[in-house]
């Protein structure tokens, strides 16, 4: 019998790709409006390439972009990028349709809920709180907890331990 449902966070409960895309585009447009002469489409590809090589949660992506583009970090452009990125992220950080309703339905039926995410702990928890999902989960395991990414069994074994359940009593979505 299923006693718990384990979810991935990004691109399962929320549209991480859309949020990241819109936030990066906002940042690039803002730097351009601040006077940085860039081609938005090419610059977008460059920023996404930095994320792909450094990790999707890389905090210094615009520093690297500016160093590559103009040879140094201009704080005017950096500030424009960071503020616009945060605003774009916040505006596009949304749960998929029916996520809250589905989670509430599972909870009301006595099903435990958990998250296994490859995101760093702080970023995962910020998204969970921002979406007002923090009170719904019995266990959350992030990369910082397990030091290994899916599909490694380590994060799954850790969440099973936190839930006090066996692999035969859970289902993973994501």
Predicted regions, residues:
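Short alpha-helical
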Residues: 22, 101, 122-123
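Substrate-recognition "cap/lid" segment bordering the active-site pocket of phosphatases
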Residues: 87, 91-94, 114, 120-173
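Catalytic-core regions built around general acid/base machinery
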Residues: 98-110
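Active-site phosphate/pyrophosphate-handling residues
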Residues: 60, 101, 154
């Amino acid at each position: 019998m299923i006693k718990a449902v384990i979810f991935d966070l990004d691109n399962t409960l929320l549209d991480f790709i859309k949020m990241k895309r819109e936030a990066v585009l906002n940042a690039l447009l803002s730097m351009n409006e601040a006077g940085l002469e860039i081609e938005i489409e090419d610059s977008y590809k460059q920023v996404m390439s930095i994320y792909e090589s450094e990790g999707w949660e890389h905090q210094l992506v615009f520093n690297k972009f500016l160093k590559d583009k103009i040879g140094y970090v201009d704080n005017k452009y950096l500030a424009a990028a960071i503020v616009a990125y945060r605003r774009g992220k916040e505006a596009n950080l949304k749960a998929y349709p029916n996520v809250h309703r589905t989670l509430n339905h599972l909870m009301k039926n006595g099903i435990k809920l958990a998250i296994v995410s490859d995101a760093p702990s702080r970023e995962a928890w910020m998204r969970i709180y921002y979406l007002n999902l923090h009170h719904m989960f019995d266990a959350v395991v992030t990369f910082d907890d397990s030091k290994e990414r899916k599909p490694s069994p380590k994060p799954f074994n850790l969440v099973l331990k936190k839930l006090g359940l066996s692999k035969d009593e859970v289902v993973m979505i994501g």
